[in-house]
Amino acid sequence: MMKVIWFSSLICFVIQCSGDSGPIICAGPIHSNKSADIPHLLGYSEKICQIDRLIHVSSWLRNHSQFQGYVGQRGGRSQVSYYPAENSYSRWSGLLSPCDADWLGMLVVKKAKGSDMIVPGPSYKGKVFFERPTFDGYVGWGCGSGKSRTESGELCSSDSGTSSGLLPSDRVLWIGDVACQPMTPIPEETFLELKSFSQSEFPDICKIDGIVFNQCEGESLPQPFDVAWMDVGHSHKIIMREHKTKWVQESSSKDFVCYKEGTGPCSESEEKTCKTSGSCRGDMQFCKVAGCEHGEEASEAKCRCSLVHKPGEVVVSYGGMRVRPKCYGFSRMMATLEVNQPEQRLGQCTGCHLECINGGVRLITLTSELKSATVCASHFCSSATSGKKSTEIQFHSGSLVGKTAIHVKGALVDGTEFTFEGSCMFPDGCDAVDCTFCREFLKNPQCYPAKKWLFIIIVILLGYAGLMLLTNVLKAIGIWGSWVIAPVKLMFAIIKKLMRTVSCLMRKLMDRGRQVIHEEIGENREGNQDDVRIEMARPRRVRHWMYSPVILTILAIGLAESCDEMVHADSKLVSCRQGSGNMKECVTTGRALLPAVNPGQEACLHFTAPGSPDSKCLKIKVKRINLKCKKSSSYFVPDARSRCTSVRRCRWAGDCQSGCPPHFTSNSFSDDWAGKMDRAGLGFSGCSDGCGGAACGCFNAAPSCIFWRKWVENPHGIIWKVSPCAAWVPSAVIELTMPSGEVRTFHPMSGIPTQVFKGVSVTYLGSDMEVSGLTDLCEIEELKSKKLALAPCNQAGMGVVGKVGEIQCSSEESARTIKKDGCIWNADLVGIELRVDDAVCYSKITSVEAVANYSAIPTTIGGLRFERSHDSQGKISGSPLDITAIRGSFSVNYRGLRLSLSEITATCTGEVTNVSGCYSCMTGAKVSIKLHSSKNSTAHVRCKGDETAFSVLEGVHSYTVSLSFDHAVVDEQCQLNCGGHESQVTLKGNLIFLDVPKFVDGSYMQTYHSTVPTGANIPSPTDWLNALFGNGLSRWILGVIGVLLGGLALFFMIMSLFKLGTKQVFRSRTKLA
């Protein structure tokens, strides 16, 4: 049967043969000399073309919508009819290219079992109408009894018909194309090597069509998987990701098509005669194979046979090996993917506990070894990696005093993440100083009532002894000097004498008389007397005891330095009305600027109302101060892998007509790639000349065409969110306590106000902190595992090679599929190297995984410790390893803040029971106050240098508050206002000076505010004088004089006793002698 179909400017000949099936030929119309041009979207051809075995017929039809013809293909555009009739489908494979149904004889096709689709569906019975390649074979499909295949070939409908004409859930799902050919067998060793390389390309696939591909601990449900493959005649197919193909031309009888000009295809018998008897005309290649008839007989009466412009036999290059497979294709299979077991998330650590040690803690984990841990005490933190069940973690030396809350966050080797809290009582006050005559002893003499006087006496005695030794040494040096200088003086005297003698002789020649001689003799005698006086001169004795009082007096004079401390602000913008009972209901509006305090401290905004003895406080307690990334535009980075493929076509075969087609551009796709890659993906195409001639498997000696394409893909779907940091700004974690007692935690970043809570909004104003090396850092987060890293990256829109962000996508979905309309890249990231038959690629892409592993959080960069943050303002927080100060304050805006104030004055009395801690330090001194109050109220303590406010409960209770002092000995009267009741309390106690905390390996601290005392001041001489003699200039003067005189008297007493002892010893020796 023969049909001729006209369409637009193309004419298509479709032949059905009883035996061998002929190809589809697309040629220009016979009535026109103009060649038919097909727009080069998938390929470029002219004059004579073939929709060959790997042409993706449906793709060709999709890009040539003007075509209205008959094609032996089960799918395609809706307006396409199908040929031959449906009752002949058993002979036509929609999977294989049209007119090559004889290839079915090369394959073993088994009947479908239990399902007629790749996805679950009903079981079909009846005739098979197309096949589907599976991982280990080929399966035929059909419609169930009482059903027939629809014209489109994609649905089965009931023969009796329904209202819709279709049956639900009967859609046949199939995607793919296959080319089959005679195979060159390969040994089992080569097959195993190909299999191993395939497994390395698909490490996350567990099973394919129910057959084990990789061993997995956990796997997903089966899901569609589109993949290129080749059948090499062994137990299963080899699936491939990155491979190359080349086509070699080997002519046979079915590679030629015979037709009569002006009529159409020759009949089967005529074509068979042409190919066997050589009685027809043909092109050079046909004549070489079958022979041709020569003569002037009209061309219309004879068949003309021409070589079909097809790619030839395919050779696949994969894993460094070249194979001529039985079948090569691209189709959909069902695969299960590896599913990793979810990691154990944050929880409690069974068998974990803390032990407090000097300067740190010991963390014990009984169930598993410790992998890593971060322990924070106050605003000092320390991190450690152990691998043991008992780990000692040290903080900054000398940083912790008194009762301190401990926060632990860590992970065990078995994967368990944990967090828990505890507390330690570190030595406080003078108990923290446990050495004698050491550095701490010199800074805190008040802690040594007896030892300090002993130390002073020893110092004075050593001072006097040193001065005596010094004067004696100077005296000895003077005597030694006179011995050395005497010969020099004698030499100068002799020289002087000789010069005078010469002068006298000159004068004798000029003067006459004995008078001149006598005068010269007299002058010489006077000179001799002067010389004698010079020689007899002796240095005066120096009284060494005069220097000690002078030096000690200079050392004792100094000035004390003071530091700013925590203060509170009072607001008078209050309007009140009488409430129920003895309460006033007040509403206040305003703004206040509070000094920012250090972690663990509070800043208070104190509210009072006229006529009410009561007061309320709004408190801001700082829990942490860190540096946070102020993000600029974020983008998404895929875990990209470079891919490339190439196909070599001989000259005048397929798309390679007269060389590389001019319409093949960077966005073009070869016909061989049509189903193997996403047309919307990010890539770059090209065409280059390859080898030609018989040595390269081509009929034509002209250079062949190597169509190549390089692209990137995300095989594992891993996506990284990259957030470049425009700046690193201070960020605080604060606990806001309202006057009503309600508490809310906020995470304000510098300059960004918090949400309004009960009419109150807080803005943290922290100064920028300049740290070198942080400007190019970016937060890098893997969206699935939540892995965090901090590393240099490209800014959004920039693609500098060598940094994270060479490929940037605008959304998570576009990064998963790497779409060209949602991602940008530099095509030079994937290099391509052309060879004789194919092209190979190499990657310059920076591995985000490798960078993230190297710079994983926690990490230390530029003197800062970066760790994971769990608040909304940034994923990562930075803390200085050593003391680093910033300036900051809190701007509090309150509008309509409600206060309930009592009009009854409380009866409140108390006393200070203890004063301990440190002075000129970050934590301040701890003052214990015992109060008795007749009702709940607010107490306000005001001392000379500091003040604080705290809540008081009804009854007798003890309270501990922080106050800052700048001297060691505290003895002063402070004002106590408790519920309107005024009284005085006396503070007495000794405070210690804590040295500036020193960095310990693994420790770091949160940023603190420089407006709060930091411990950077050293004790002045006045601190010593206060510790020794008490406060007051008169006490200092009398004390210093008394010490000097007492030391002098003690010194003479000791010297007298020493001389007396020496005399007694001398007398005893004399008597014995």
From Swiss-Prot:
It comes from the Viruses. The chain crosses the membrane at residues 454-474, 1037-1057. Residues 650-656, 691-705 are annotated as: Fusion loop. One of its GO terms (biological process) is symbiont entry into host cell. The record marks K1071 as: Important for glycoprotein C and glycoprotein N subcellular location. Glycans are attached at N33, N63, N853, N914, N936. The keyword Thylakoid does not apply. It comes from Dabie bandavirus. GO terms for cellular component: host cell endoplasmic reticulum membrane; host cell Golgi membrane; membrane; virion membrane. Residues 536-562 are annotated as: Internal signal sequence for glycoprotein C. Disulfide bonds join C26-C49, C143-C156, C180-C327, C206-C216, C258-C305, C266-C303, C274-C280, C287-C292, C349-C352, C356-C424, C376-C381, C563-C604, C576-C586, C629-C725, C644-C841, C650-C698, C656-C705, C660-C687, C691-C696, C778-C793, C809-C823, C908-C978, C918-C921, C943-C974. Belongs to the phlebovirus envelope glycoprotein family. This is Envelopment polyprotein. Residues 1-19 form the signal peptide. Residues 475-535, 1058-1073 are cytoplasmic.
